[in-house]
Amino acid sequence: MECNLVNLSNDNVGTAQLNPLIFSAKQKLSILHDIVRWQLAKRRAGTHKTKGISDVSGTTAKPYGQKRTGRARQGSLRSPQFRGGGIIFGPVVRSHTYSLNKKVRKFGLKIALSLKYLNNQVIILDNLNIDVKKTSEMCKCIKNFKFSSFLIVGDYGDDLLRAAKNLHYVDLIKPIGLNVFDILNHECVMLTKDTLKHLEGRLL
């Protein structure tokens, strides 16, 4: 598979070869759904907590005798039926992460890249070695591409990162950090030639 090779100014500088095993994978949206749920679950802090009957401060004394009052028997004022009592089966601090097979995660990355390629939303860059230090300069470069949001994947320098940091529609990521959620969350995915080699070693 052959596609145009461009620079950040959208000037054609040659052609690049795309591996069909990565960019022509069979579309299974259910796998993308599973992977996105898995990624979002990993991001959850899990710091939710309510106080149960053992956490609520208060007396441990039995409020009144078991018999002869005519009222329902009670053993603690910290019980959930009382005002200020504990919460039954409330959330506790825990991890929301769960395991997902490596093969499924690899296949999901192929599906996401193939989906973007089918929709003409993949751009191959020759490199990220461009003399851009200001946000205004980066904005001019990005305006050459007619998309609403960009995920730039490659080995970028500090100057490029600083120039793009204040653009909410541009995100930079290293090849090792490429993931399904970020791919689907941006309209256009920009990959460098070195990133293509990294993907072949990672996914094949």
From Swiss-Prot:
Q: Which GO terms describe its cellular component?
A: ribonucleoprotein complex; ribosome
Q: Which GO terms describe its molecular function?
A: rRNA binding; structural constituent of ribosome
Q: Where is this region: Disordered?
A: 49-76
A single GO BP annotation from the record? translation
Q: Which UniProt keywords apply?
A: Ribonucleoprotein, Ribosomal protein, RNA-binding, rRNA-binding
Keyword Zinc carried by entry? no
Gene3D superfamilies linked to this entry: 3.40.1370.10
> What's the superkingdom here?
Bacteria
- UniProt-listed InterPro entries: Ribosomal_uL4, Ribosomal_uL4-like, Ribosomal_uL4_dom_sf
Indicate the quaternary assembly: Part of the 50S ribosomal subunit.
HAMAP family recorded: Ribosomal_uL4_B
Q: Which PANTHER family match?
A: 50S RIBOSOMAL PROTEIN L4, LARGE RIBOSOMAL SUBUNIT PROTEIN UL4M
Q: Which NCBIfam families match?
A: rplD_bact
Which family is this protein grouped under? Belongs to the universal ribosomal protein uL4 family.
The protein's job, in short, is: One of the primary rRNA binding proteins, this protein initially binds near the 5'-end of the 23S rRNA. It is important during the early stages of 50S assembly. It makes multiple contacts with different domains of the 23S rRNA in the assembled 50S subunit and ribosome.
The name this protein goes by in its record? Large ribosomal subunit protein uL4
Species of provenance = Wolbachia sp. subsp. Drosophila simulans (strain wRi)
The coding gene here is rplD
